[in-house]
């Protein structure tokens, strides 16, 4: 078929792009019987390999990501192997993100009504197909009992730090995240690496850990404490991502609440399109900032969340997003979820959506990487 021949051509193009990325990788990934440990770090070998390969991948192309991609989409929920992205272009995203909100409560389903058992299964599936999984955490407010967006009290972060009234409760909450990440194991006992992205968009003030709700020192202490608890709980299969919004205007502002190089592997930012011109300006500004910091701090850089709700622009992928991002060595760009319960709340196309054909062109571009393009991340 024409589609098949187009895909063959596209695969050959991408194969050329990726040859260098895949030939030099040492095999010690999903096929082995158990995780090895790198003597120089607190990471499993697979996790060390992931970090090393992320640094290589960014010189070959940009991985495409989508939140909750295989959990649900427009007009479907929980169907095995289904993906709106795959339905449009024939491949899964190279990166899929998931959210752990409500795991702290001991619930069996997330704040978006996805069973944590399903999230675990999808992370394992993404690992087996060679892609990467990222985790965010829209947790409840430990002081008020409200959600992440409850900013009615400005002392929440202070209350969870050592000596605070909610410190013990919070420590237990983080340990539930530890237990989940530690449970991500293949049948052969290999711990699956994930990118954990806590305390995101903190340069705004819409979450209880936001800029106006804690001091820079309190925010950094929150980060340090979170990573310390995870490490003490034996989590050795996590990399960490720091992702403010697009509010920082320069590197100094970006680093104002940066918790430190020893706690962060990936730096990025979240920004969404409302007005096209200001979106492009925000992208350019924020990409220049993380590109500069990434080089000086030796960090992987990414667009950790972005998108255009409803994608009403039929050429958005190739005429707005791609021309800006292809100029920078970012490792991935991730768009938000296709909500099955809010039919206008979607950020990736589905079959018949107005930008679907353009997304196929975006997919065929040698600079964009999908799951089949990055199957050696852990080797």
Where are these regions (language model features)?
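Short, small-residue-biased leader/transition segments that mark boundaries at the very start
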Residues: 2-9, 28
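N-terminal export leaders
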Residues: 9-15
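N-terminal module-boundary/linker segments of secreted carbohydrate-active enzymes
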Residues: 33-95, 101, 109-113, 373-379
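Alpha-helical scaffolding within the catalytic cores
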Residues: 47-50, 76-85, 117-121, 177-180, ...
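Substrate-binding cleft of secreted/luminal carbohydrate-active enzymes
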Residues: 62-69, 299-379
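Aromatic-lined carbohydrate-recognition surfaces of secreted/lumenal glycan-active proteins
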Residues: 65-67, 197-199, 223-252, 299-311, ...
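Aromatic- and acid-rich polysaccharide-binding/catalytic face
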Residues: 96-98, 254-280, 336-338
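Substrate-binding cleft of extracellular glycoside hydrolase catalytic domains
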Residues: 101, 105-236
């Amino acid at each position: 078929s024409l589609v098949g021949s187009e895909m063959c051509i596209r695969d050959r193009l991408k194969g050329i792009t990726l040859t260098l990325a895949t030939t030099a990788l040492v095999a010690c990934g999903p096929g082995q019987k158990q995780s090895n440990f790198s003597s120089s770090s607190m990471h499993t070998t697979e996790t060390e390999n992931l970090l090393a390969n992320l640094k290589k991948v960014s010189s070959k192309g940009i991985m495409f990501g989508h939140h909750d991609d295989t959990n649900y989409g427009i007009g479907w929920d929980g169907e095995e192997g289904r993906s709106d992205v795959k339905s449009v272009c024939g491949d899964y995203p190279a990166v899929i993100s998931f959210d752990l909100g409500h795991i702290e409560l001991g619930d069996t389903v997330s704040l978006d009504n996805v069973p944590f058992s399903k999230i675990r299964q999808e992370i394992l599936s993404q690992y087996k197909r060679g892609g990467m999984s990222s985790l965010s955490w829209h947790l409840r407010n430990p002081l008020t009992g409200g959600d992440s967006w409850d900013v009615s009290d400005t002392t929440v972060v202070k209350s969870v730090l050592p000596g605070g009234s909610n410190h013990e409760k919070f420590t237990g909450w983080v340990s539930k995240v530890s237990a989940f990440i530690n449970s991500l194991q293949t049948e052969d006992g290999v711990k699956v690496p994930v990118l954990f992205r806590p305390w995101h968009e903190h340069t705004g003030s819409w979450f209880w850990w936001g800029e106006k709700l804690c001091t820079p020192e309190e925010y950094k202490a929150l980060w340090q404490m979170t990573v310390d608890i995870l490490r003490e709980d034996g989590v050795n299969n996590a990399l960490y991502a720091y992702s403010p919004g697009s509010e920082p205007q320069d590197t100094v502002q970006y680093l104002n609440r940066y918790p430190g190089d020893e706690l962060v592997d990936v730096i990025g930012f979240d920004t969404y399109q409302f007005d096209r011109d200001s979106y492009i300006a925000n992208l350019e500004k924020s990409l220049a900032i993380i590109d500069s910091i990434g080089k000086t701090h030796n960090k992987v850089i990414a667009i950790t969340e972005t998108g255009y709700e409803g994608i009403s622009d039929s050429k958005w992928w190739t005429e707005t997003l791609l021309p800006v991002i292809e100029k920078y060595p970012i490792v991935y760009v991730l768009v938000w979820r296709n909500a099955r319960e809010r039919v206008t709340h979607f950020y990736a196309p589905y079959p018949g959506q107005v930008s679907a054909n353009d997304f196929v062109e975006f997919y065929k571009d040698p600079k964009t990487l999908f799951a089949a393009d990055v199957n050696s991340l852990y080797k």
